[in-house]
Amino acid sequence: MNLKKTMMAAAIALGLAAPAAAAEKYKIGYDIYFGGNSWSVQLYKEFQAEAEKHKDAVEVSYTESELKADKQVANIEDLITKGVNAIIITPISPTAVIPVLKKAQAKGIKVVLLASKIKSKDYDALVTVNDEDFGKVGAEWLAKKLNGKGKIIALNGISGISASDDRWAGAQEVFKAYPDIQVVSAVDASWDYAQAKVAVSNLLAANPEIDGIWSQGGGMTLGAIDGFDAAQRKLVPMTGEDNNGYLKRWVALTDKGYTSVAPSKPTWLGSESLLVALKLLKGEAVEKDTIFPPPVIDDANVAKSVRADLSDSFWVNTRLSDDEVRAAFKD
């Protein structure tokens, strides 16, 4: 009798456990829009780390778009075919993805835009920082450092990508209030060290007077510094970003009078995008546009922000653990 009761109890326990074991996970599609710089890699790693924390609830399908808008459209089509419940993308083009995102929404798929906008409202949530404010922070700081006058170079990312366009729009709005600040040249350097160094070197050769650099990327600012060094020109005030390698250089140059400011677009947005997607899938209330103010590193707090023990490739505004950072970046 006792054996029979024990077997029945076990059967009941198994029966109770069965629905939990059989519970379906949310299917999330995540498009890695680009893997060509450390910021985009860390953005993806932040998402991946958050997904690992929720591995009992989510199953992720990854695609890679290699900064190609047509490939991103095809990847979203593929994710729709796979029957995902939500798609998280960083739009490469603000227009090219609109038709396929409409298609996804028509099938009941939640669409979360990560770190970049589109020119329509065909999405369920946007998670980003205010890129116009990012541009304004650096521009206002630079204008004041130059006492409202001087010749500057502007280093942009990639025209057509909303983050780059919005940052430059914000900066231009500020510079309009300072008529004695002359933008000698505004160049696209793709957030890339080498492209920025070449561009700055060429502009220094053609312009005996450059008083400042407005840059919307830490790697580009490093390229600008090295361009000045190669030309044997005295460093000028430059804006940067929260790239650890840039912060290390900044700290090393403070004794020489170098000064900077670094607004940030935190890579933890990748983590936040999954949390927002999960809320949407659970039917919880979510703001359509979650837009954070850009954190700012300046001369007063850079020494506390830099991580001398971690990779130059690392971006300091993160939710990753030190071990996760070391696993992501081996340099």
List PLM regions with ranges.
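Hydrophobic helical h-region of N-terminal Sec-dependent signal peptides
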Residues: 8-16
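Bacterial N-terminal signal peptides that target proteins for export
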Residues: 1-8
